[in-house]
Amino acid sequence: MFDLLTIPRSMRLASPGRSRLRRWTFRLTSLFAIAGLVVVGYRWWTQPRPTPPTEIFRGVIYTCIELSEPECRGLLHLVKIDLNAPGIQLYMTRTDPEAVAHGYQYRLETAPAVLEREHLALVVNAAYFTSDSGVLQWSGDWARGVQTIVADGQVSHIDPHSYLLWFESDLTPHLEFEKPPKAAVLRQARWGIGGGAVPLWKGKLREAAAGHEMDRRTAVAIDTGRRLLWVAVFENASSTAVAQVLAEQGAKDGFLLDGGHSTTMVLSPQAAHVQSGSLIHEWRPVATFLGIRAESLQ
């Protein structure tokens, strides 16, 4: 009778339990590999690509530009809104009554949720904020805004350090180059959003208000005379480069909003001729949003 120890390892029979374990291990490994390939393929297929100026809603033109300058790299998603176009409406986050009752102003939300609920053509993150969140931020967490927000005539608070980009009831845009904004301006403003510095003024870069640190950026700019609004998100840019790029696009006055991990732009599924959905978005909920409603081309 053979001693099991004398039988070569290659001739020994594997136990049924061990064989099943190996088969299941192989199947699971294959399944995860296939799932990984699907995810990578989907992300490649759906990732934004450079796009020439394209009207996606009535009066709303989207452009995607790939930049490779020293202080501006990656994709720029730029939306120009003609405030003269029929059907254009603005959206700004209003203070939440329940949050106010608890000593806060807002509840954190994600951009896709706001886009769907408010029936927006596009949405971007707005002002800086603080929240009662711990290590992770979740939708529904209490939050306070840093800069002033005017939402349908409702003023969130007066931040003494905020410049104000604001709109009259007919959507004529202005940038108040005095902080805090005067009471008369706040009475006129139907919509408004505060910013901490103005790197673009009268079509030129203000170097004293701009820096060279690179990060994800969200910015807004206007041309009062032509009644135009630009909303832009940059994958990686300095505030100096942001101001220069917006000036090259024809904007006259503008500033940065919250950026970094807050940077978000989402387009509605009704956007014509371009890929919709999240162009830059990390699913981080934020406190306030700037949105646009517009008539569909479809």
Task: Describe each model-derived feature in a short phrase.
Residues L122-A126, L175, G254-D258:
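General beta-strand structural signal in soluble alpha/beta enzymes
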Residues L136-H157, R206-L257, S262-Q298:
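Conserved, well-ordered active-site substructure
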Residues F129-K204:
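Active-site-adjacent helix-turn-beta-strand microarchitecture at beta-sheet edges
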Residues R12-S15, R22-S156:
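Zymogen propeptides
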Residues R94-A99, K179-A184, V233-S238:
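Short, solvent-exposed aromatic-acidic interface loops
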Residues M1-R9:
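N-terminal intrinsically disordered, acidic low-complexity segments at the extreme N-terminus
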Residues D82-A85, S131-D132, W166-T172, K202, ...:
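Short acidic-glycine loop/turn motifs at beta-strand connectors
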Residues L67, L76-L78, G192-D223:
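Conserved beta-alpha junction segments in alpha/beta enzyme cores
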